[in-house]
Amino acid sequence: MRMIAGSAFMDKNTPSYASITPEQAYANTKELIDRWNNKGRLNYAVTPRSAYLLSEAEIAVATRLVKEYPNIHVQTHLAENIESVNMVQKMFPGKGDYLDVYNYYGLVTKHSTFAHSIWIDDKDFELLAKKNASVVFCPTSNLFLGSGLFNIGLANKYHTKVALGTDYAAGTTLSIPQTMNEAYKVTQLRKAFAKNPDDVKPLDPFENYYIATLGGARALDLDQYIGSFLPGKEADFIVLNLQSTPILALRESRSKPLKDTLFAIEIVADDRAIEHTYIMGEKLK
């Protein structure tokens, strides 16, 4: 299956067993890029763990690698919680806010994806859109950790690319339908706490499916290969059984428009609904 992956590196505010020097980070990452990038369906992502876990020398490693490999993917964290935002400002004085630090080091590009991106503002979303970079909405992780509520409405205002993510480290599921369920709840909570609730729109089922499929593919610059059923694309998909559980069958039986059926899947479907899995058109399950 299609995959973009990378080995994270960090050297500040981290246990000694997880810390590596800038020299090690460069050598290790370069070796992995040369070994795995553009090999079959695999691509590599330069992965500076998070700005508050990086010295200036360590983050400069990512800059160097991006210059050496102009089309390489970059993945990192952005403004996941208030504490990390404050730490970045203290560690990189004079370089602006969290996103400004990444931009200063040349890491905001059309190949960059920024996980979480909760505590950012209009200026940041505008810059992300201008650079054609992407953010990854990780609702189960954000709710589990109490990090905050992602503002998909603000992302849409500036046409910033958004992908739906599970965040396996702190997320509570790898199931896409269940992750979509939590994404919907995040927008509902934003509405509850908003100064002007009428300005916050619920996450429409069509948009939810979009960020989980084609939107995610576009965020990763892979939409020429995956994300939809257009002829010529790679056929990676699942087949769902809408009668797999009594509650899903009941909910679906009362769904008339397509939007209702899609909403039923994202709210009450779970892994039991997966009937078949196809990779490159070959049935695996």
Describe the role of every protein-language-model region:
Residues 1-117:
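Metal-coordinating catalytic core of metallo-dependent amide/deamination hydrolases
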Residues 2, 66-71, 107-110, 127-136, ...:
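Glycine-enriched alpha-helix->loop->beta-strand junction motifs that scaffold or abut catalytic
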Residues 46, 77, 128, 135, ...:
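Conserved, mostly hydrophobic/aromatic
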Residues 47-52, 143, 197-198, 225:
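Conserved short loop/turn motifs at secondary-structure junctions
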Residues 122-123, 129-166:
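A conserved active-site cap/scaffold subdomain adjacent to cofactor or substrate pockets
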